[in-house]
Amino acid sequence: MAGGPHFIRKNGWVDENRPTRVLLLGSTGSIGTQALEVVAANPDKFTVVGLAAGGANVELLDRQIRETGVSSVAVADPSAAASLARPGVLSGPDAVTELVRTTEADVVLNALVGSLGLEPTLAALESGARLALANKESLVAGGPLVTAAAAPGQIVPVDSEHSALAQCLRGGSADEVDRLVLTASGGPFRGWTADRLESVTPEQAGAHPTWSMGPMNTLNSATLVNKGLELIETHLLFGVDYDRIDVTVHPQSIVHSMVTFTDGSTLAQASPPDMKLPIALALGWPHRIAGAAAACDFSTASTWDFEPLDSQVFPAVDLAREAGKGGGCLTAVYNAANEVAAQAFLDGIIRFPRIVRTVASVLSEADEWSAPPATVEDVLAADGWARERARQLVKQEG
C-alpha cells in the first residue's frame, strides 16, 4: 500500500487507567450529538474536555456545555459566542484551531462539515492526539499534507465505510489486499433516470433512505458526491490505488464495506445503520465498546442486495476518481466546487443535476492545480479558486 495505512496501531494514545479525554469539534451536528450520547453512556471510558461548534444552534451548545461541564469552548460565529454569555469562549474563524492547540485531549473527534475542518485536523495531528476523523473534507482537501502530518495509527476514521475497512483489514496484512469495496445505499434517487432528476427538490434530496445525517451530507449522498469523497478518503487512508477501489450499491446499508484478499476471499463488516458504532470504535480504538449499537438479527428472514452503480446518471464517483488520479490539489477543487454548487441547489438557484455538472466543469479547467501542495496556503488557494469559478458558473445558470 503506497504511503502505508494511517490507522493501524496495536495500542492507542491513551492512558487506559483513566477515562479517555475527548475534544469534540462540531458538537451540535449529527455526529457530534451522537458522540455525546456515546460518551454519556460510557462515563468510565470517556470524558469530554472541550466543545466546538459553528454557532447555528446556540441553545443546544449551551445545553451541551451545562451537561458536560466543560470550560474549553470555541464558536466560529462571534455573535453566537457572545449570545452564550459565558466567559472564556473562543470565537472567530481561528477559534476552533486555537481550541485544539490549547486543550489537552487524548482524542480529537473532528465532526465539522466542509473543508473548514482542515486546519483543526492539522492542529490535532500536531498535538499528538489521536484524530477520530468524521470531517472527510479536510482529508480530501489537504491530501498529502494531512497524511504526511499523521503518525502511523494516529488517524482513525469515523465514516461507517472506512471504519468497516479498518475492521476488515485486521484480518490480513497489507500485501494480501487485492481490492477494497465501498458500499453505497444509492441515495433516495436510486433507479431514477437523468431526465427525472431535473425535477428533484431540496426536500426530496434531504430524505435519505437509511441514514440520519446533516443536510449537506444528506445532499451529497443523493448526488453520490459523498461516495466520491469517500473514494478519495479511502485512497489516502489505506494507500490503495484508485483502480483497486470499487463502489457497489447496497440499498439496505447493512454491509458497510468489504475487503477482497489476494487468495480470493472477501471479508465484510455488517451492522444495522447506526453511526454510534463507528463513533464508539473511533473513540475507543482499538477496543470495542460493548453495547455501542444493535447487532444484525439473523433469526428473521432478510435480503441483502448488491448492484452496480449507474455512473451515467450519477457520475460523481468517476469524477472523484479522476481528480484523485490527477493529484495535487484537484481533490480540494472537487470538494470546494461541490460545496458551492450544493448550496446553490439548496438555495433554489440551480437544478439538482447541475451540482455535479458544475463540479465537472470546474475540474475541466483546473489543470494548474495538479501540483502537490507544499503548504496549507496552497490548498486554500486551490479551494478559493474553485469556489470562485463555481460561483461564476452558478451565476450563469441562474
Curated annotation (Swiss-Prot):
Disulfide bond annotation, renumbered to this chain:
none
Q: Does the keyword Metal-binding apply?
A: yes
Q: Which UniProt keywords apply?
A: Isoprene biosynthesis, Manganese, Metal-binding, NADP, Oxidoreductase
Q: Which pathway does it operate in?
A: Isoprenoid biosynthesis; isopentenyl diphosphate biosynthesis via DXP pathway; isopentenyl diphosphate from 1-deoxy-D-xylulose 5-phosphate: step 1/6
Sites where the protein binds 1-deoxy-D-xylulose 5-phosphate: K136, S160, E161, S185, H208, S221, N226, K227, E230
- Listed GO molecular functions? 1-deoxy-D-xylulose-5-phosphate reductoisomerase activity; manganese ion binding; NADPH binding
EC number(s): the record gives: 1.1.1.267
Q: What class of enzyme is it?
A: oxidoreductase
Task: Kindly indicate whether the keyword Endoplasmic reticulum belongs to this entry.
Answer: no
Residue positions annotated to bind Mn(2+) are D159, E161, E230
Q: Which domain of life is it from?
A: Bacteria
Give binding positions for NADPH. T28, G29, S30, I31, G54, N57, N135, E137, G214
Q: Which cofactor does it need?
A: Mg(2+); Mn(2+)
Q: Which family does it belong to?
A: Belongs to the DXR family.
Task: Describe the task this protein carries out.
Answer: Catalyzes the NADPH-dependent rearrangement and reduction of 1-deoxy-D-xylulose-5-phosphate (DXP) to 2-C-methyl-D-erythritol 4-phosphate (MEP).
The record's section on PANTHER family has:
1-DEOXY-D-XYLULOSE 5-PHOSPHATE REDUCTOISOMERASE, 1-DEOXY-D-XYLULOSE 5-PHOSPHATE REDUCTOISOMERASE, CHLOROPLASTIC
Q: By what name is this protein known?
A: 1-deoxy-D-xylulose 5-phosphate reductoisomerase
Organism classification, top ranks? Bacteria, Bacillati, Actinomycetota, Actinomycetes, Mycobacteriales
